[in-house]
UniProtKB/Swiss-Prot annotation:
Kelch repeats lie at residues 77-129, 133-187, 188-241, 243-289, 308-361, 443-494. This is Kelch domain-containing protein 4. The modification Phosphoserine is found at residues 413, 418. The keyword Phosphoprotein applies. Residues 11-24 have a biased composition (Basic and acidic residues). PANTHER family: KELCH DOMAIN-CONTAINING PROTEIN, KELCH DOMAIN-CONTAINING PROTEIN 4. The lineage of its organism: Eukaryota, Metazoa, Chordata, Craniata, Vertebrata. The keyword Cytoplasm does not apply. Keywords: Kelch repeat, Phosphoprotein, Repeat. It comes from the Eukaryota. Residues 1-10 have a biased composition (Basic residues). Residues 1-33, 346-378, 402-432, 481-522 are annotated as: Disordered.
Length: 522
């Protein structure tokens, strides 16, 4: 009895500390948010000029990360919304909506009146109601210099059948945040975690909210048991038994003034209704067997075949006294909730290329690209480990599966139906973090993300797919060469604070002009 009382008292103390920190962060960030709210309002004024929905064929979207890639519940389409891009001097944020037609291998830009404000690191969930709905909550907006942040707490729904945006206002919603996770569970949305940051302070969350899709009301859950510590960037999925898995994530703590210590979480928890009651939930810590991923942050997840959860990529940053070493990944892992077991994704390779691999490995050992990121029509996969050392001592290790150069991609035949059959055979997505994943008809799609080389951030715009039924080889649907992406060095000039509209996106024409000036790939 005494032990239980101590635990409850300790729990209440932690809640009070978190409440004080949230109040402190809120107070210090209020002025920043007021400044950014004016900027957001300016962009919303520009968006308000749209009076009708316009759908236009377009090239693939520009490089970005921390966007959302969702599967249309009724059509063979992927829906890309939002995201961010940094060119070394300015941060660009987007509220563009793109649709990728899987069968036709084409992109369409959909301009809809009164869209959500520009954002990244939000969450988007698709439900089948009413011909399909895309629900978007939270995310963040950044100043052009990337030093101030505004965290949204708004909820939007895109009605896919009518192509209209609607903001849904309801009391009791979660506080403003980004890096949270959200899933559809029965006729509810369930949201977990995230973080809120101002210039000097930050707070991470481990709270759980539900949004009822019938009554349009928020409720905060208070699960029993010991759940995850506060974190953002974790992964969240629904099990076949109706539970919800929380895995991994990232958080940091201040150890002394101006010194923070980050933690990459690799634990797993199960959240499920207690005794079948939807108003009472319980946390349980999980200890899966099998080969689990190495600790990392910035990894991505999607629901795969047989209700398994698929994990891809990420980065492991090792902080030392005078350097920061980052290792990026492009590996695949599967978690089977039915067996509570991890599996490492291994590709079989195309049957027709097995005899050519030995030669491919020999040729690959003779050279490789400094910033290689896949390639069309190559054969003979081999893993290459590269280290890039910057002037400041930063070491970035990139592990990549490359293929022998010199093989031209085969042209698409007229009788091919889908891009996963027609795309060029490639070694797959290069190592990256913060990529966007989606699975449709048993095919995994990986879009965008980023990796670092010294002080340079390379933002990606490539699109790859992998047939999860066959697990043979990746197909490159959209390619890019990171070498061609210009990086602008930091400057002490105050010119960055000018031309705010270009820095944050403006309208589409202004976006394209700004990216062309910065050398960014479209």
């Amino acid at each position: 009895m005494g032990k239980k009382g101590k635990k409850e008292k300790k729990g209440r103390g932690a809640e009070k500390t978190a409440a004080k920190m949230e109040k402190k962060v809120s107070k210090r960030s209020r002025k920043e948010e007021e400044d950014l709210e004016a900027l957001i309002a300016h962009f919303q004024t520009l968006d308000a000029k749209r009076t009708q929905t316009v759908e236009a064929p377009c090239p693939p979207p520009s490089p970005r990360l921390n966007a959302s890639l969702s599967v249309h519940p009724e059509k063979d389409e992927l829906i890309l919304f939002g995201g961010e891009y940094f060119n070394g001097q300015k941060t660009f944020l987007y509220n563009e909506l793109y649709v990728y037609n899987i069968r036709k291998d084409t992109w369409t830009k959909v301009d809809i009146p009164s869209p959500p404000p520009r954002r990244c690191a939000h969450q988007a969930v698709v439900v089948p109601q009413g011909g399909g709905q895309l629900w978007v909550f939270g995310g963040e907006f950044a100043s052009p210099n990337g030093e101030q942040f505004y965290h949204y707490k708004d909820l939007w729904v895109l009605h896919l059948a009518t192509k209209t945006w609607e903001q849904v206002k309801s009391t009791g919603s979660p506080s403003g945040r980004s890096g949270h996770r959200m899933v559809a569970w029965k006729r509810q949305l369930i949201l977990f975690g995230g973080f809120h940051e101002s210039t000097r302070d930050y707070i991470y969350y481990n709270d759980v909210y539900t949004f009822n899709l019938d009554t349009f009301t928020w409720s905060k859950l208070s699960p029993s048991g010991t759940g995850p510590t506060p974190r953002s960037g974790c992964q969240m999925s629904v099990t076949p038994q109706g539970g919800i898995i929380i895995y991994g994530g990232y958080s940091k703590q201040r150890v002394k003034k101006d010194v923070d210590r980050g933690t990459r979480h690799s634990d797993m928890f199960l959240l499920k209704p207690e005794d079948g009651r939807e108003d009472k939930w319980v946390w349980t810590r999980m200890n899966p067997s099998g080969v689990k991923p190495t600790p990392r942050s910035g990894f991505s997840a999607a629901m795969a075949l047989n209700h398994q959860t698929l994990f891809f990529g990420g980065v492991c940053d090792e902080e030392e006294e005078e350097s920061l070493a980052g290792e990026f990944f492009n590996d695949l892992y599967f978690y089977d909730a039915t067996r509570n077991r991890w599996f490492e994704g291994q590709l079989k390779g195309p049957k027709s290329e097995k005899k050519k691999r030995r030669r491919g490995r020999k040729e690959e050992s003779e050279g490789g690209s400094k910033l290689a990121c896949g390639g069309a029509g190559t054969q003979g996969p081999v893993q290459v480990v590269k280290e890039v050392v910057a002037e400041d001592g930063t070491v970035v290790t990139i592990k990549q599966v490359l293929a022998a150069p010199g093989s031209a991609g085969q042209p698409r035949s007229e009788d091919e139906d889908s891009p996963e059959e027609a795309g060029s055979s490639a070694p797959g997505p290069c190592p990256r973090s913060n990529a966007m994943l989606a699975v449709k008809h048993g095919v995994l799609y990986v879009y965008g993300g980023m990796f670092e080389a010294g002080d340079r951030q390379v933002t990606l715009s490539d699109l790859h797919c992998l047939d999860l039924h066959r697990m043979e080889a990746w197909k490159a649907l959209v390619e890019m060469d990171p070498e061609t992406q210009e990086w602008l060095e930091e400057t002490d000039s105050e010119e960055d604070s000018e031309e705010v509209e270009g820095a944050e996106g403006g309208d589409e024409d202004e976006d394209e002009d700004s990216r062309e000036e910065s050398g960014a790939e479209d």
